[in-house]
Amino acid sequence: MVRPLKPSQIRRLIRQTGVRKHRNSLRYKMRIKKGDTVQVISGDDKGKIGEVLQVFPERNMVLVEGVNIVTYHRKPQREGESGRIETKEAPIHACKVMLYSKKQEVASRIGYQITADGRKVRVLKKTGEILD
């Protein structure tokens, strides 16, 4: 597993190569894809099940439908307009979710297998269900 660089290592890279690398240019290996069904395993929304709407590999976060709902109080932008309260999903860290099998109704870790035709596919470790 590749570990993310520490800030001191990034500064050393910049000095050695002369190339400016920003910390946010690092990308994490995401085992969860858009459209996957996941279950939240920790935090305020523990136990909730939802579909992944978006993946953010630079921040190692995912946006899950119906999870981590935040409320925004918006001021009126124009004269005569009234303020409003908006709610929407906010991203959560990828380590807080596990893939969920709808057939077996169980959350599981992810493994990888190579099929007979040479494709690398994701597999649920508990059930053996192939995802890709």
From Swiss-Prot:
SMART domains: KOW
Keywords, ordered alphabetically: Ribonucleoprotein, Ribosomal protein, RNA-binding, rRNA-binding
A GO cellular-component term linked to this record: ribosome
GO molecular function, one term: rRNA binding
GO biological process: translation
InterPro entries attached to this UniProt entry: KOW, Rib_uL2_dom2, Ribosomal_uL24, Ribosomal_uL24_CS, Ribosomal_uL24_KOW, Translation_prot_SH3-like_sf
UniProt entry tagged with the keyword Ubl conjugation: no
CDD domains according to UniProt: KOW_RPL26
Similarity comment: Belongs to the universal ribosomal protein uL24 family.
HAMAP family: Ribosomal_uL24_B
Function: One of two assembly initiator proteins, it binds directly to the 5'-end of the 23S rRNA, where it nucleates assembly of the 50S subunit.
UniProt subunit comment: Part of the 50S ribosomal subunit.
Name under which the protein is recorded: Large ribosomal subunit protein uL24
Species of provenance: Synechococcus sp. (strain JA-3-3Ab) (Cyanobacteria bacterium Yellowstone A-Prime)
